[in-house]
Amino acid sequence: MLTTTLLFIATAMAEIIGCYLPWLWLRQQGSPWLLVPAAASLTLFVWLLSLHPAASGRVYAAYGGVYVVCALVWLWGVDGEALRPTDWIGAALALTGMGVIASGWR
């Protein structure tokens, strides 16, 4: 389960970075060259997602819980926003759902 969770975290970070860089380009007038590492990051995201040990729909559902937590860490660490109590509660619920789904993998 630890290996799967670490793989989910790497997958989420690749997705977040791959989406954040075009956001910088579009919203913050960043360089169009940001699209090159964004494409590489999203390619890595897709490849990492293919490494997960269960049917794709189940993987996507469980991955969503880890993605929520990683996005909140990004919100705090990169965007500089303080997490609210509702963020913490939502993260706990998302991880609980991820754990329930992943516990049924064979």
From Swiss-Prot:
Keyword Transmembrane included in the entry's annotation: yes
GO CC annotation: plasma membrane
Pfam families: UPF0060 (PF02694)
Main location: membrane
Signal peptide stretch: none
InterPro entries: UPF0060 (IPR003844)
Bilayer-spanning residue ranges: 6-26, 31-51, 59-79, 85-105
Disulphide-bridged cysteine pairs: none
Localization annotation: Cell inner membrane
Keywords: Cell inner membrane, Cell membrane, Membrane, Transmembrane, Transmembrane helix
Membrane topology: Multi-pass membrane protein
Family: Belongs to the UPF0060 family.
PANTHER family: UPF0060 MEMBRANE PROTEIN YNFA
Protein name: UPF0060 membrane protein Csal_2746
Organism: Chromohalobacter salexigens (strain ATCC BAA-138 / DSM 3043 / CIP 106854 / NCIMB 13768 / 1H11)
